[in-house]
Amino acid sequence: MSERVILAYSGGLDTSVAISWIGKETGREVVAVAIDLGQGGEHMDVIRQRALDCGAVEAVVVDARDEFAEGYCLPTVLNNALYMDRYPLVSAISRPLIVKHLVAAAREHGGGIVAHGCTGKGNDQVRFEVGFASLAPDLEVLAPVRDYAWTREKAIAFAEENAIPINVTKRSPFSIDQNVWGRAVETGFLEHLWNAPTKDIYAYTEDPTINWGVPDEVIVGFERGVPVSVDGKPVSMLAAIEELNRRAGAQGVGRLDVVEDRLVGIKSREIYEAPGAMVLITAHTELEHVTLERELGRFKRQTDQRWAELVYDGLWYSPLKAALEAFVAKTQEHVSGEVRLVLHGGHIAVNGRRSAESLYDFNLATYDEGDSFDQSAARGFVYVHGLSSKLAARRDLR
């Protein structure tokens, strides 16, 4: 078996320390793999050089922005996926893509071991390792942060002692994960639930309590569930996310302060920013309200929740998720049209929707002249619909 270790590299504290630590403690060569998911910040060339400076024998950078948008963000929209009705799976959907590219790098660079920098308290360890087991069960997994009980203080001390080029201090110990779909911030004083987030935590959104300028009205167009236009201009999925990140972020839309149930059994607090994601999910959900038949819509809302739970729990490659997506593909056949939304003061308000596939019938819905609804049929419908309840009540009154 090869002694090379293929490491999922973010450029942050834990994975930078991991490169040096693996080399010093095990003698194995490390190939660092950094994936560009549209996270912005440092240039990927800088991240690549940092990996080399930390001791990696090779550092691979993969531009996966379009792949991430089309293959991972889009399914999140199609499934209206909000874990616990709030979290749009910012980090969760990125992990299976990283796993895919780490496995590819292991095959290309002769690696028999894959490594990640996740702790034993988080969900990401599960997402990575279940992903590896699904795609490459022959690979060994190394998790130094978890298996050797690193704390952030220990990692910072190791970085300082070994001159690892990483900008993290004990006074600013936030853990940040970001991509084009959103941004997640945790640890530090945020671990105390009563502490309000400070302004410096946010990067994707403006302060909605200050920016009370002109509201931004945007029209998002869909074809078979897929976002295809913004204000009538054709866009790719990536371009749609980027445009709505910019516009919704300027209005303070997409800030989320969440206490969520982690897979490992604990509750954790996360601060999320996902302006474009929240606009797209809101618009898509609204268009489904117009185009899906009642029973289909009801059932899909159940599968939406289950899909979000599967992805959150690291089961991206599971048979159930694949089966749900086959169902969802069928539901999207008529989800075409446009939704108009107003973005302002941190809020999203839908104020218009139109679709050639709409099930809304004006003549049936109107209370004015032209009403074509046969109200004489209502009496019998109400009687039959409530008959079982009536019979049960009659029995209970005996």
UniProtKB/Swiss-Prot annotation:
<protein>
    <recommendedName>
        <fullName>Argininosuccinate synthase</fullName>
        <ecNumber>6.3.4.5</ecNumber>
    </recommendedName>
</protein>
<dbReference type="InterPro" id="IPR048268">
    <property type="entry name" value="Arginosuc_syn_C"/>
</dbReference>
<dbReference type="GO" id="GO:0000053">
    <property type="term" value="P:argininosuccinate metabolic process"/>
</dbReference>
<dbReference type="Pfam" id="PF00764">
    <property type="entry name" value="Arginosuc_synth"/>
</dbReference>
<dbReference type="InterPro" id="IPR001518">
    <property type="entry name" value="Arginosuc_synth"/>
</dbReference>
<feature type="binding site">
    <location>
        <position position="260"/>
    </location>
    <ligand>
        <name>L-citrulline</name>
    </ligand>
</feature>
<keyword id="KW-0067">ATP-binding</keyword>
<dbReference type="GO" id="GO:0004055">
    <property type="term" value="F:argininosuccinate synthase activity"/>
</dbReference>
<dbReference type="GO" id="GO:0005886">
    <property type="term" value="C:plasma membrane"/>
</dbReference>
<dbReference type="InterPro" id="IPR024074">
    <property type="entry name" value="AS_cat/multimer_dom_body"/>
</dbReference>
<dbReference type="InterPro" id="IPR018223">
    <property type="entry name" value="Arginosuc_synth_CS"/>
</dbReference>
<keyword id="KW-0963">Cytoplasm</keyword>
<dbReference type="GO" id="GO:0006526">
    <property type="term" value="P:L-arginine biosynthetic process"/>
</dbReference>
<comment type="pathway">
    <text>Amino-acid biosynthesis; L-arginine biosynthesis; L-arginine from L-ornithine and carbamoyl phosphate: step 2/3.</text>
</comment>
<feature type="binding site">
    <location>
        <position position="87"/>
    </location>
    <ligand>
        <name>L-citrulline</name>
    </ligand>
</feature>
<feature type="binding site">
    <location>
        <position position="119"/>
    </location>
    <ligand>
        <name>L-aspartate</name>
    </ligand>
</feature>
<feature type="binding site">
    <location>
        <position position="175"/>
    </location>
    <ligand>
        <name>L-citrulline</name>
    </ligand>
</feature>
<dbReference type="InterPro" id="IPR014729">
    <property type="entry name" value="Rossmann-like_a/b/a_fold"/>
</dbReference>
<feature type="binding site">
    <location>
        <position position="124"/>
    </location>
    <ligand>
        <name>L-aspartate</name>
    </ligand>
</feature>
<dbReference type="GO" id="GO:0005524">
    <property type="term" value="F:ATP binding"/>
</dbReference>
<keyword id="KW-0028">Amino-acid biosynthesis</keyword>
<keyword id="KW-0436">Ligase</keyword>
<feature type="binding site">
    <location>
        <begin position="8"/>
        <end position="16"/>
    </location>
    <ligand>
        <name>ATP</name>
    </ligand>
</feature>
<dbReference type="Pfam" id="PF20979">
    <property type="entry name" value="Arginosuc_syn_C"/>
</dbReference>
<keyword id="KW-0547">Nucleotide-binding</keyword>
<feature type="binding site">
    <location>
        <position position="123"/>
    </location>
    <ligand>
        <name>L-citrulline</name>
    </ligand>
</feature>
<dbReference type="GO" id="GO:0005829">
    <property type="term" value="C:cytosol"/>
</dbReference>
<feature type="binding site">
    <location>
        <position position="127"/>
    </location>
    <ligand>
        <name>L-citrulline</name>
    </ligand>
</feature>
<feature type="binding site">
    <location>
        <position position="123"/>
    </location>
    <ligand>
        <name>L-aspartate</name>
    </ligand>
</feature>
<feature type="binding site">
    <location>
        <position position="272"/>
    </location>
    <ligand>
        <name>L-citrulline</name>
    </ligand>
</feature>
<feature type="binding site">
    <location>
        <position position="117"/>
    </location>
    <ligand>
        <name>ATP</name>
    </ligand>
</feature>
<dbReference type="InterPro" id="IPR023434">
    <property type="entry name" value="Arginosuc_synth_type_1_subfam"/>
</dbReference>
<comment type="similarity">
    <text>Belongs to the argininosuccinate synthase family. Type 1 subfamily.</text>
</comment>
<dbReference type="GO" id="GO:0005737">
    <property type="term" value="C:cytoplasm"/>
</dbReference>
<keyword id="KW-0055">Arginine biosynthesis</keyword>
<dbReference type="GO" id="GO:0000050">
    <property type="term" value="P:urea cycle"/>
</dbReference>
<comment type="subunit">
    <text>Homotetramer.</text>
</comment>
<dbReference type="InterPro" id="IPR048267">
    <property type="entry name" value="Arginosuc_syn_N"/>
</dbReference>
